[in-house]
């Protein structure tokens, strides 16, 4: 993954997110859906914690809306669009504003929290996050931890959660969906690795 990100001038997160977009595109195409020009909006957390506080417990992030270019057929162009969107979002104040709104909601009455969260959730189809895990094996009571995985929390009417985790040199892609919208998430998951391999092949050919 780092080979692709360095060669193409983007982040590891951009590469993994573009691979997820490719997997969604492939799935929808096999269903016969019209995806010409289609974008899916995902809520993505952006870390706002300063580096000097990296080891402190707790969360310190803002939420931004990322448009996933499902309709883009070219894998390289798809990655470029994801990377450009992420750069623009990181340079904007959207994450800081989102953090402030979430903090204010947390201090407000419960009767306002639910409708407010529902309003935010209507603006997105999915929530997606990539968590960089430890790149060396962990041990618990002397036993090696073979794999790690997490499931991104969802709220309101959002029907898809995209989870990406790196651990001990491997990348794990998970998907949690509303069965009424995506009854077979495994069909999307199995497309993730081939989509990444397309980007890797493009990188090696250049």
Model-based region annotation:
Residues 7-52:
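Hydrophobic "lid/gating" helix adjacent to the active-site nucleophile
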Residues 8-9, 67-72, 177-182:
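A generic structural motif
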Residues 155-206:
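Extended, hydrophobic beta-loop-alpha segments that form or line the acyl/peptidyl-thioester binding
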Residues 1-10, 82:
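Surface-exposed, Lys/Arg-rich phosphate-binding patches that contact polyanionic backbones
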């Amino acid at each position: 993954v780092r080979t692709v990100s360095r060669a193409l001038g983007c982040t590891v997160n951009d590469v993994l997110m573009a691979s997820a977009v490719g997997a969604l595109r492939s799935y929808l195409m096999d269903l016969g859906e019209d995806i010409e020009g289609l974008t899916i909006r995902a809520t993505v957390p952006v870390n706002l914690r300063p580096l000097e506080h990296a080891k402190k417990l707790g969360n310190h992030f803002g939420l931004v809306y990322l448009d996933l270019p499902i309709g883009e057929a070219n894998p390289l162009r798809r990655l470029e669009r994801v990377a450009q969107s992420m750069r623009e979002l990181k340079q904007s104040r959207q994450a800081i504003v989102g953090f402030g709104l979430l903090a204010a909601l947390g201090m407000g009455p419960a009767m306002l929290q639910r409708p407010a969260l529902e309003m935010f959730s209507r603006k997105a189809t999915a929530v997606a996050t990539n968590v960089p895990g430890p790149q060396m094996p962990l041990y618990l009571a002397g036993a090696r931890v073979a794999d790690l995985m997490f499931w991104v929390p969802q709220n309101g009417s959002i029907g898809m959660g995209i989870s990406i985790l790196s651990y001990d040199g491997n990348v794990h892609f998970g998907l949690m969906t509303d069965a009424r919208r995506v009854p077979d998430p495994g069909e999307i998951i199995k497309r993730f690795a081939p989509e990444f391999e397309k980007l890797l092949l493009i990188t090696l050919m250049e």
